[in-house]
Curated annotation (Swiss-Prot):
Binding positions (GTP): 148-154
Subunit structure: Found in a complex with TEDC1, TEDC2, TUBE1 and TUBD1.
Name this protein carries in UniProt: Tubulin epsilon chain
GO BP terms in the entry: microtubule-based process
Underlying gene: Tube1
GO molecular function, one term: GTP binding
The entry's keywords: Cytoplasm, Cytoskeleton, GTP-binding, Microtubule, Nucleotide-binding
Cellular component terms (Gene Ontology): centrosome; cytoplasm; microtubule
InterPro entries: Epsilon_tubulin, Tub_FtsZ_C, Tubulin, Tubulin/FtsZ_2-layer-sand-dom, Tubulin/FtsZ_GTPase_sf, Tubulin_C, Tubulin_CS, Tubulin_FtsZ_GTPase
Top-level taxon: Eukaryota
Location(s), subcellular: Cytoplasm, Cytoskeleton, Microtubule organizing center, Centrosome
Family: Belongs to the tubulin family.
Length: 475
């Protein structure tokens, strides 16, 4: 069994990470009721004997003693990390695997990347190495950060290059939260643009998340929960926005519900690596099957169902609806419509009581409405994990390498250009050692080249699919 390490950077990264670890513990507790440390739990947790001197000895088998997350927490302010260390999950994190500063990055990519990157490189590397040494078979680093702030975008993408240099064989999956057009950080277009160049060059897979899409999904769920319509009662533990197993009209913090959606995405993404199933998918297979070209590694994700109705049995029609929803624009985690764009490849990660025949039937049903590139007409990768998320009988995560991601990048470029034309706030960046104006122009060129690659693919959309010649055998 393989292990993964989560590196959560900045306020957003640490808040999502906290939700992820909370949900992961609940999920494993629901499955592993005997309290035995098994391969599934070891994928994200170490079992530590706290009675041992020093770091505590790792226990590979037997009963669970004290679980420690395979995580590195990084933030250049202390607030969020201190909050985590005083909260209910405080014992899950190893205090020696935290890096914090006091001053923060001031919503400036250059400070996070150039200043704190250089200042903390060796400390970060030491903690990454320690996490790697504690794994029997390290397969993947999951990096979680925002694109709009200074620490997440700057230091988050700095450590991506560190990981590439030091652990070239270990996959780098990035969950990057993109700011909405209403973002209150005025410099977020600069930060996002500069971070994009690093993601293009140093990530294996990027799962872009759009704050606006998360907000829209929450609004949609709230409409159902509060509608009071007959037959629309929602199972309390099935809300994709809830981590407390209870429906609450008001979350403790405005971003809690949004963060839980992203945490559920990560749980589903790793489900096959953690639990048994009739059709398992390794994490390396995602990159292998869904990324045909190195730079086109942005995967659009969707999650279904968003909730489960309490008073309805699940007939096949409802199961089929789950598959249909995964391709609708209302369920995408960025503002995108994959059905009207071009697929390079698509993965369906199914959990729970679903048969392979259900999977095949739905792919055949949906295929005519979806356009794939001519050279990858059968570009499907599927996974069936027998363990559903808590509160659901089944769920589906769809990952699409699809040209529908292009408008997100085009909007980012437009927002950047509006700011950059005025040279607004540019001096805050250029006064940082190592920053030059060419850093901005190179970042724009990098993103424009990426957009052009998607445009070139889109241009092939209306072309007929060539018949593949078959070999004739001479007898």
């Amino acid at each position: 069994m393989t292990q993964s390490v989560v590196v959560q950077v900045g306020q957003c990264g640490n808040q999502i990470g906290c939700c992820f670890w909370d949900l992961a513990l609940r999920e494993h507790a629901a499955v592993n009721q005997k309290g035995i440390y098994d391969d599934a739990i070891s994928s994200f947790f170490r079992n530590v004997d706290t009675r041992a001197v020093g770091d505590g000895g790792s226990i590979s088998k037997g009963r669970i003693s004290s679980l420690k997350a395979r995580a590195v927490l990084i933030d250049m302010e202390e607030g969020v990390v201190n909050e985590i260390l005083q909260g209910p999950l405080r014992d899950v994190f190893d205090s020696k695997q935290l890096i914090t500063d006091i001053s923060g990055s001031g919503n400036n990519w250059a400070v996070g990347h150039k200043v704190f990157g250089c200042l903390y490189r060796e400390q970060i590397l030491e903690k990454l190495r320690k996490s790697a040494e504690q794994c029997d078979c390290l397969q993947c680093f999951f990096i979680i950060h925002s694109m709009g702030g200074g620490t997440g975008s700057g230091l988050g993408t700095f450590l991506l290059k560190v990981l590439e240099d030091e652990f070239p064989e270990v996959y780098r999956f990035v969950t990057a939260v993109y700011p909405s057009s209403e973002d209150d950080v005025i410099t977020s277009p600069y930060n996002s643009m500069l971070a994009m160049k690093e993601l293009n060059e140093h990530a294996d897979c990027v799962l872009p998340i759009d704050n606006q899409s998360l907000f829209d999904i929450i609004s949609k769920i709230d409409l159902v929960v509060n509608s009071g319509k007959l037959g629309s009662a929602v199972k309390p533990k099935s809300l994709i926005t809830s981590n407390m197993g209870a429906v609450k009209k008001h979350h403790k913090k405005p971003f809690d519900a949004m963060n839980n959606i992203v945490a559920n995405l990560l749980l589903s993404l790793t489900s096959s690596a953690r639990f048994e199933g009739s059709l398992n998918m390794d994490l390396n297979e995602i990159s292998m099957n869904l990324v045909p070209f190195p730079k086109l590694h942005y995967l659009v994700s969707s999650l279904t169902p968003l909730y489960t109705l309490a008073d309805v049995n699940i007939p096949p029609r409802r199961l089929d609806q789950m598959f249909s929803d995964a391709f609708s624009k209302d369920h995408q985690l960025i503002q995108a419509d994959p059905r009207h764009s071009l697929y390079l490849a698509c993965a369906l990660i199914v959990r729970g009581n679903v048969q392979i025949s259900d999977l095949r039937r739905n792919i055949e049903r949906l295929k005519p409405a979806l356009q794939f590139v001519s050279w990858n007409q059968e570009g499907w990768k599927t996974s069936l994990c027998s363990v559903p998320p808590v509160g659901h009988s089944h769920s589906l995560l769809a990952l699409a390498n699809n040209t529908c991601v292009k408008p997100t990048f085009m909007e980012l470029r437009e927002r950047f250009t509006r700011l950059y034309k005025k040279k607004a706030h540019l001096h805050h960046y250029l006064q940082v050692d190592g920053m030059e104006e060419s850093t901005f122009t190179e970042a724009v060129s990098s993103l424009s080249a990426l957009i052009q690659e998607y445009s070139d693919l889109d241009a092939t959309k209306s072309l007929p699919v060539p018949d593949v010649p078959r070999l004739s055998v001479a007898l």
